[in-house]
Each structure stands twice: as C-alpha cells, then as structure tokens.
Amino acid sequence: MKLSVYGKGGIGKSTTSCNISVALAKRGKKVLQIGCDPKHDSTFTLTGFLIPTIIDTLQEKDYHYEDIWPEDVIYKGYGGVDCVEAGGPPAGAGCGGYVVGETVKLLKELNAFDEYDVILFDVLGDVVCGGFAAPLNYSDYCMIVTDNGFDALFAANRIAASVREKARTHTLRLAGLIGNRTSKRDLINKYVEAVPMPVLEVLPLIEDIRVSRVKGKTLFEMAETDPSLQYVCNYYLNIADQILALPEGVVPSESPDRDLFALLSDFYLNPSKSHVMSEDEELDLMMV
C-alpha cells in the first residue's frame, strides 16, 4: 500500500506523517516514509536528525546507481520505520517531481520499493504543481492534513482537484481529511458538506503535538516517558486502522475557487446565531 500526505505549508504534515507511520508499524506493518521536500526534514521526528538525501547521494556517486547500497539512503527511525529523504534541486532551479522520480527509480534498483507493506510519501506545501503531484502517480490513497481555517481548507480543495485529475489514469482515491490541532471543526464540516469526503480524524489543539516536532520525537516516543500522552497516540492509531481496512475512498469533485471562497467567507461574515466568532477566527479572516 502506498500513501501520500498533502496539505497547506506549515499545517503539520510531517508530524502527522511520522506519527501515522509509527502507528502503522505498531499494527505490525513494515513501513517506509519518504520525505518529498527540499528541506529534507520530513523524517526528523523519526530519526532525531536530518538524514542525507537521495539526491545528494546520487550526486556524490555521479549518478552511478550500481555504486549505491540500501544503507546509503535508508535510515532506521523510531518504531522500526525506515526513512528516506528525496531532497530537491537547488533553490530556483530544477523540478521536485524529477527528484521524486529519481528516488523511486533508485529504490526500485535497490529492490527496496516493493519490500514494504506501506510506503508513505510526505509531500511539501500546498502548491500541487505537476512535479510535486508526482507521488500521487504511485499512491493508492491520498490524505489531506488541514485545520479549521480558511487557508488550509482552500489548499485542501486544490489538492482534491489534483487527486481527481490523477484518478483519471491511476487507481488513486482520496482517503479523507485529517484535522490537525484544531479546537473546532465547524468549518471543516461546512467544507465536506460542499465537497463530500471522509474525515478520518480531527486532533484537538494539543500543545504536545507541536512540542514533539521541536524535540525531534514522535508522540509515541514521548508517551514512553509520559503515559498521559497515550490518548494522543490513539488518534493516530485510529487513522492507521482506517487505512489498513482498505477504505473505498472517494474521487472528489472540488468546489470552484470562487464558490469556495464565497462559502468560507460567508461562514465568517455571516455566522449563525449558534456560532460566535472567536478571536483566532477573526485573525484568520484578517489574514485572507
């Protein structure tokens, strides 16, 4: 099974991806997480350091694939999760999609691509160009990380459009949304009413999720010394269980940009009597 995780930049994709990878490993699966971001920090909370990238290794070996061994590019992370960082081209040059393709090519050359029960691609940012949509070509499911804010859901809608486009020629489905660190889900609910899709989980506003990223540890590792965090791990285990159940998923029909802008704006500008706009939501609106 191959999964891709997308979402607005800074929404918590890598933290979410690492914890889902560990949750899948806890369920007995052999997992490989591939970071698809030039920052090459996707697997930081699994390994505790920035591992060398595949593109750097290829350059060192002058692109002689036969001179590269699995241990040169695959690093063992927490919970037995194997980790790879694709890396990226120099800033302002090259194509990230090419780097993803080279990563998959090398892993296949090493007979590693098909050795795992689950491969999870953690993909940068919210601008899904043809290059960084490349992981969708290899994926069975896409998961979109969001929060209860305008910008994150607007980005989710654009990613849903990419899933729909790729599903024309690939066996790709959208597994659903994952709400990350949000105290409410009313705007998420409003969005999925307009664009029907599953909501796999909504994680509450838990500060330890953010802290885990800074510490370079997953919530599962932190829970070993602080059992009170086990309830947070259960959110990720629930997501893993849903994915392992092989959900039908959906081919989404995204909302036109202007329609979605009007829908989400109206939610803020004309709140229902039961909805009182919070200071955080007012700030979100000011940033639009």
Swiss-Prot record:
Note accompanying the cofactor annotation: Binds 1 [4Fe-4S] cluster per dimer.
GO process annotations (BP): light-independent chlorophyll biosynthetic process; photosynthesis, dark reaction
Assigned EC number: 1.3.7.7
Coiled coil: none
Pathway: Porphyrin-containing compound metabolism; chlorophyll biosynthesis (light-independent)
Cofactor annotation: [4Fe-4S] cluster
Catalytic activity: chlorophyllide a + oxidized 2[4Fe-4S]-[ferredoxin] + 2 ADP + 2 phosphate = protochlorophyllide a + reduced 2[4Fe-4S]-[ferredoxin] + 2 ATP + 2 H2O
InterPro entries linked: NifH/chlL_CS, NifH/frxC, P-loop_NTPase, Protochlorophyllide_ATP-bd
Residues that hold [4Fe-4S] cluster according to the record: 95, 129
Keywords: 4Fe-4S, ATP-binding, Chlorophyll biosynthesis, Iron, Iron-sulfur, Magnesium, Metal-binding, Nucleotide-binding, Oxidoreductase, Photosynthesis
Record-listed ATP binding positions: 10-15, 39, 180-181
Residues annotated as binding Mg(2+): 14
GO molecular function terms listed in the Swiss-Prot or TrEMBL record: 4 iron, 4 sulfur cluster binding; ATP binding; metal ion binding; oxidoreductase activity, acting on iron-sulfur proteins as donors; oxidoreductase activity, acting on the CH-CH group of donors, iron-sulfur protein as acceptor
Disulfide bonds: none
Domain of life: Bacteria
Top-tier EC class: oxidoreductase
HAMAP family per UniProt: ChlL_BchL
Subunit structure as annotated in this protein's UniProt entry: Homodimer. Protochlorophyllide reductase is composed of three subunits; ChlL, ChlN and ChlB.
Protein family per UniProt: Belongs to the NifH/BchL/ChlL family.
NCBIfam families per record: DPOR_bchL (TIGR01281)
Described function: Component of the dark-operative protochlorophyllide reductase (DPOR) that uses Mg-ATP and reduced ferredoxin to reduce ring D of protochlorophyllide (Pchlide) to form chlorophyllide a (Chlide). This reaction is light-independent. The L component serves as a unique electron donor to the NB-component of the complex, and binds Mg-ATP.
Protein name: Light-independent protochlorophyllide reductase iron-sulfur ATP-binding protein
Source organism of the structure: Trichodesmium erythraeum (strain IMS101)
Gene, per the UniProt record: chlL
